[in-house]
Structures are given as structure tokens and as C-alpha cells.
Amino acid sequence: MNPLLPFLMAGDPSLEALPRLLSEAKALGLPALELGLPHSDPIADGPVLQAAAQRAINRGATPLRVLEGLAGITDSPDLILFTYLNPLLQIGADRLRRLLAPTPVKALLVVDLPFGEEPAFERGLRDAGFPMVPLLAPTTTLDRAQQILAERPDPGAAAPFAQRFAYVVARLGVTGTGQGTDLAPVARRVAELRALSERPLAVGFGLSDPRSLAQVRSLGATPVVGSALVQALADGQGLREALSGRMVGDG
């Protein structure tokens, strides 16, 4: 099981700092990392990630510059590109595949892409080696979840975590800390999904403190840390310090 899936916003604090952060993440032993593509209308993001995206945009971190800046980087965990559909459509499918090819990006998590809405776009990316991460909300029925998992198939145990996992949304609403997350429904949800598929599961939205992360791990799932980490970095902490207490074996 992957013990932690952190989230970073590309371009915050700067595009120039991104290679160093990715290198530090790999040195910490993180096998995968979510990398947010800054977007001006991030409907699923809470105030912390919205502010980070705006800072990145203000410093010139366009989607194109982010992807171009990732080219050739090898000292990095596997990246899951966390993004919205419109910036990708503006780049175009063919160009997007060419841009992704020399980067450490292994998969995409497109938060506002309804399942089945852009089949040709999604299929082209998957065939090029960039599958879409299945996103399973609390309102997703089990029948629907089974369909999504079948249409976004597990490539198998030989594939990296970044290309295998399904993302379980812990609660409705936007990302962020301080809102509280009742993990009892999450435990039931994880158990239900385990009966449908053997693929790895990651749980995100509203997780931040070491106790909640440990609870998610006890379910055999990977906790996602986003807003708490992004805020710590914005407050001037280094990556190792920001993740202190949240890694397995800390504390």
C-alpha cells in the first residue's frame, strides 16, 4: 500500500521551485504525488487551493508552461496531474499527449470530467499511457462505481500505483481542512469498493491530521493530503517539515 499521496500546486511558490520540490519528495520515499495544474475557476477546490492556484497564475504558471517545465524531469515521484477539463481541451488532445510524453506524469485526475462525456479524448490519452483516475464520490452508486471501474480499468499489479488507484472522495463539498470528515462512512465505502475491485484506493478531501491519516491507512487505503500541505508550504515550511507527523513511522 502507498502510505501517503501528497498534493502540490504547480507554480506555488514558483515554477522554478518545482523541480526541487519533486526531488525532495522522491528523496522522502514518496512513490507518487498529485500535481495541481493552476486553473482560474477551480470549482472543486477550497480556499487554500484556490489561493495557491491564483498565486501560481499571478507568477505566470500557465498550464502550458507547467507541462513544458516538467519535460525531462526524472528525479521525481510518479505524478498524477490534478486538473480541470477546459485547460486540457484548450491545449488539444494531440498536443497534450506530446507534452506529457517527456514528463513524470503517469495519469490524470480530471475533477470536472463526467464519466463517459469525452470518450475519444480519454481513450486517446489512455492509449498513449496516461489513464484517467476513477473518481468515486459519496453519491456514486455501487452499480455506477462498478461501471466506472470497468471503463477505467486497472492495468494490473505490474503497473505503478499512479496508474492503478481509484480516488474515493471522503465527503461532499470542496477540498480543505477544518471542516471535519466522518470516517465511518468512508470505512463502509472502502469495504464496498473492495468487493468490486482489488485495485488500490486513495481517500481524499478533508484529511489533514495524523490521526485521520492513520485511520485511512488502517482501512488499507492511501490518504491524500492537499490543503494542509499547501498551506504549510505557503507559510514557509519545507516539504519535509510540512509532512512531519504525516508519514508512516513519524511521531
What is the role of each PLM region?
Residues 1-76, 90-93, 148-163, 237-238, ...:
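Conserved N-terminal beta1-alpha1 strand-loop-helix module at the mouth
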Residues 57-61, 83, 104-117, 130-149, ...:
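Catalytic beta/alpha-barrel core
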Residues 187-199, 208-251:
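Alpha/beta catalytic cores of nucleotide-metabolism and tRNA/nucleoside-modifying enzymes
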